[in-house]
Each structure stands twice: as C-alpha cells, then as structure tokens.
Design a protein with these regions (language model features):
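Active-site-proximal alpha-helix that buttresses catalytic centers in soluble enzyme cores
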Residues: 1-122
Length: 122
C-alpha cells in the first residue's frame, strides 16, 4: 500500500488563495516527508478531488487520505465531500480513499489564534 495525501479546500476566484492551499500541500509534503501530496478543490480551483486522486494514482499511490482544509464543519464537509469521495471510491475500486476529520475545534487552531492575537495586542 502506497500512501498519498490530498489537501482538500473549497477553492476561490482569488487565485492567490488557491496558491496558498498549494503551498500548504507542498509544505506538508516537505515537513512530513510524504512524497505524494496534492491539493484539490471543491470548486473554483484545479484540480478537483477526482483529478488529484488520479494524479496520485498515476504516481503509484493506492491509499489516499483526504484532509479537509476547512476551519469548521459545514454542508460541504458533511454532505458534499463524503458523497464525492464515495463516488470516486466506487469508480476506482483499486484505490482506498479515507477522509480525515475536519479541523473543526482542533487545539492547534487555538495556538494559531493566540499567536495572531499576541502579535497585535500587548
């Protein structure tokens, strides 16, 4: 089993926002030592989830972890992502696709907010 990771974001009409997601995916690969990491977007960015799955499969990944890059649980994570992931799993039965839990409430987010607050407030 060869692992691959997808950083899955909403996507934006503002290309710099999509580039930021691509940078996060690249940094995850670099810091984690994961050779197969791709960004994917629900809408307004490329590739979409299926496109990223196919990119990873072409590199040899057979077990793909989709990490939602959304701050809170909403309809896209509750309804859309599971449906899309299931459709892709049904289409490519030789691939194992797992969706990680959302960032929603992760303690690391509090640290990021504290860092921001401390950089502006005494």
């Amino acid at each position: 089993m060869t692992p691959g990771i997808i950083v899955f974001a909403h996507g934006s009409r503002i290309e710099s926002a999509n580039e930021a997601v691509r940078s996060v995916a690249a940094e995850l690969a670099r810091q984690g030592g994961y050779p197969y990491v791709e960004p994917a977007f629900l809408e307004l960015g490329h590739p979409d989830l299926e496109g990223a799955v196919l990119q990873l499969a072409a590199k040899g990944a057979t077990a793909i972890l989709v990490i939602p890059y959304f701050l809170t649980l909403g309809m896209h994570l509750e309804r859309d992502l599971p449906r899309i992931a299931q459709e892709i799993s049904n289409k490519y039965k030789d691939l194992q696709i797992t969706v990680a839990p959302p960032l929603d409430g992760h303690p690391g987010l509090v640290q990021v907010l504290l860092d921001r607050a401390r950089s502006f407030l005494p």
